[in-house]
Amino acid sequence: MANERTFSILKPDATRRNITGAVNAVIEAAGLRIVGQRRIRMTREQAEKFYEVHKERPFFGELVEFMTSGPVVVQVLEGENAVAKYREVMGATNPAQAADGTIRKQFAESVGENTVHGSDSADNARLEIAQFFNEADIAA
């Protein structure tokens, strides 16, 4: 597989518990490079746009509230087969079902506060990266 980029968010539960360094260590140990990273406070508008695909789902309001409840760390990750690799490293959405050694198994508190977001496809990664970064922000 080719070298590619994916998008990651370390969610408010990770920043609140001061575990972003530990999560980054897992990401880097998996062979992914963090080539762009910023700590931001996501606005309601940013969260609603980012999670627009879930707008009709019953958890949408709670998700937006959670994602705006504290700082997040937005990241661009790069590596071979980065999208699939990061999804594997994150683990299942429900931490109780996540494999040992994954970020969610190690750090997530619940399905709702599951520490990280990662793009589900290369196309979505490009769209998600563009919402928070421009090429000048990425040091490959």
UniProtKB/Swiss-Prot annotation:
BP terms from Gene Ontology: CTP biosynthetic process; GTP biosynthetic process; UTP biosynthetic process
Gene3D superfamilies: Nucleoside diphosphate kinase-like domain (3.30.70.141)
GO molecular function terms attached to this record: ATP binding; metal ion binding; nucleoside diphosphate kinase activity
UniProt main location, coarse: cytoplasm
Active site: 117 (pros-phosphohistidine intermediate)
CDD domains on file: NDPk_I
Keywords carried by this UniProt record: ATP-binding, Cytoplasm, Kinase, Magnesium, Metal-binding, Nucleotide metabolism, Nucleotide-binding, Phosphoprotein, Transferase
Keyword DNA-binding assigned: no
Pfam families found in the cross-reference section: NDK (PF00334)
Similarity annotation: Belongs to the NDK family.
NCBIfam families: PRK00668.1 (NF001908)
Database matches in PANTHER family: NUCLEOSIDE DIPHOSPHATE KINASE (PTHR46161), NUCLEOSIDE DIPHOSPHATE KINASE DDB_G0292928-RELATED (PTHR46161:SF3)
Subunit architecture: Homotetramer.
Protein name as it appears in the record: Nucleoside diphosphate kinase
Species of origin: Methylorubrum extorquens (strain PA1) (Methylobacterium extorquens)
